[in-house]
């Protein structure tokens, strides 16, 4: 890459791939009854969705990150919940002591995340991926129109 706008364009293209991966993982979830596979695919979808919204480093642009304005207002709460699941359980262990529920012995659960596969988030995650994908396409068109 030779220019900052080319770097942003490449980042946007990679972000499109992430949204497509989300949709592919959800398609696979909808086609299986295997609970373990559903959890693994859900984890993949969540991580792939949040990745471009996290802080990525560029050569020309110190931070490459999708902007919040690409998330539809009506799905903002679900977006934040999905980011929280990724940050607290999948990518990091950012749990507070209040969230941990200890049982007998060494077993414990995480309050609110008793089961990692949250089927109620499948449709919102699918909608988010589709709408963010469309918004990224618009952003990429603008970048191309203004010249790489």
Where are these regions (language model features)?
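Amphipathic alpha-helical interface segments
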Residues: 1-81, 101-148
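Long, charged low-complexity segments
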Residues: 84-92
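Short amphipathic alpha-helical segments with coiled-coil-like heptad repeat character
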Residues: 91-103
């Amino acid at each position: 890459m030779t220019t900052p706008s080319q770097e942003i364009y490449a980042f946007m293209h990679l972000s499109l791939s992430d949204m497509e991966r989300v949709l592919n993982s959800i398609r696979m979830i909808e086609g299986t009854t295997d609970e373990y596979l559903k959890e693994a695919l859900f984890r993949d979808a969540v991580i792939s969705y949040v990745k471009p919204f996290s802080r990525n480093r560029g050569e020309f642009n110190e931070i490459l990150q999708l902007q919040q304005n690409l998330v539809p207002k009506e799905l903002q709460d679900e977006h934040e919940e999905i980011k929280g699941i990724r940050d607290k359980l999948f990518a990091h262990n950012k749990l507070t002591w209040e969230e941990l529920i200890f049982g007998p012995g060494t077993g414990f659960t995480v309050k609110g995340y008793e089961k990692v596969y949250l089927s109620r988030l499948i449709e919102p995650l699918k909608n988010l991926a589709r709408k963010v994908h469309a918004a990224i396409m618009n952003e990429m068109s603008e970048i191309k129109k203004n010249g790489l």
